[in-house]
Each structure stands twice: as structure tokens, then as C-alpha cells.
A protein has these predicted regions:
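A generic "alpha-helical surface" signal
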Residues: 2-6, 10, 38, 54, ...
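Glutamine-centric residue-chemistry signal
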Residues: 25-30, 125
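Generic alpha-helical structural context detector
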Residues: 2, 14-17, 38, 58-61, ...
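Conserved anion/nucleotide-ligand pocket segment
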Residues: 1-25
Length: 151
């Protein structure tokens, strides 16, 4: 991301300089090479904790607005995940490694078991509420070790 933002900024400055100098050559887009992305559905945002930690984290980053990376809490309430970070597999205990994907491994700082390790849910947005820190959410929701998300 950082590297691309620098390259993009440089390309933008170069393009603006060429336009200002009257040297820019405008070329219409070749419509035969157009590709279209399918419309996103709410179901496209559903997190699959059986995926590896990197895939879960990428899914969260890919869905920042609509449809949002989402899972369900015990009881069926929706939880939108706004930030997730992989947890080092070496930091998992034997009991954590044996847990099934989607299992809450501890009350804080909100680690959830994935297919190959765990992710820490940093910011979340419960249905009908404002976004908040994952740990603050767990304190209020009384989340407990062993609860399973996404069921």
C-alpha cells in the first residue's frame, strides 16, 4: 500500500505537469477491453474463520464499507469487523490450537481462532451501535472464552 501510494502520487504529479504544459495525449478507453466487477451482496462480507489468518485479515480490509466484513455472535446478532490483525501462531497455547475456527480464545484482546492460527479483532461495530474497540465490546457483551462466532 505504502509503495503504491508513493508511485501513484508521482504519476499524478507527472500527469498534471504534462497537462499544464500541453503535452498530454488523451486516448479514449478501448471499450472491448472493459471488465466489470460483479455487484457485491451482503453475503459477500461474511467472514470464514476456517480460512488462514492472512485471508481473514485481507477480507476485513477489502470490505470497509459495503457489505462490511461480518460475522454473527452467539444468539445470532450481527457483528461487523472493521479491523483484524493476524496473531503469531507461536503465541497460541495447546488448548487454543485444538479450538475450532471462529472460537473466541480469550476475553481480551479479542483473539479468534482461524484455520491456521488466530486474528485479533481490533475494532468492531455491533448491529445498531457505534464502532468500538474489540475489547470494550467484549466487556459489554460479556463474551467468554470458548464462544463461537459465525454460527
Amino acid at each position: 500500500f505504502e509503495r503504491l501510494s508513493i508511485l501513484g502520487a508521482d504519476a499524478l504529479v507527472e500527469a498534471l505537469d504534462r497537462i499544464e504544459a500541453g503535452e498530454a495525449e488523451f486516448e479514449p478507453q478501448d471499450e472491448s477491453r472493459v471488465t466489470l466487477a460483479p455487484k457485491l451482496r451482503k453475503s459477500d462480507g461474511v467472514l470464514d474463520f476456517s480460512e488462514n489468518s492472512a485471508a481473514v485479515e485481507r477480507h476485513v480490509r477489502a470490505m470497509p464499507t459495503w457489505p462490511g466484513a461480518r460475522t454473527t455472535l452467539p444468539g445470532g446478532r450481527d457483528l461487523v469487523v472493521l479491523e483484524a490483525r493476524p496473531v503469531s501462531p507461536g503465541s497460541l497455547g495447546n488448548e487454543d490450537v485444538a479450538a475450532s475456527p471462529g472460537t473466541l480464545l480469550d476475553e481480551a484482546p479479542f483473539p479468534v481462532r482461524t484455520g491456521d492460527g488466530a486474528v485479533r479483532l481490533g475494532r468492531v461495530k455491533p448491529a445498531g451501535k457505534a464502532a468500538m474497540d474489540g475489547e470494550a465490546f467484549l466487556r459489554g457483551a460479556r463474551g467468554a472464552r470458548g464462544d463461537t462466532l459465525g454460527t
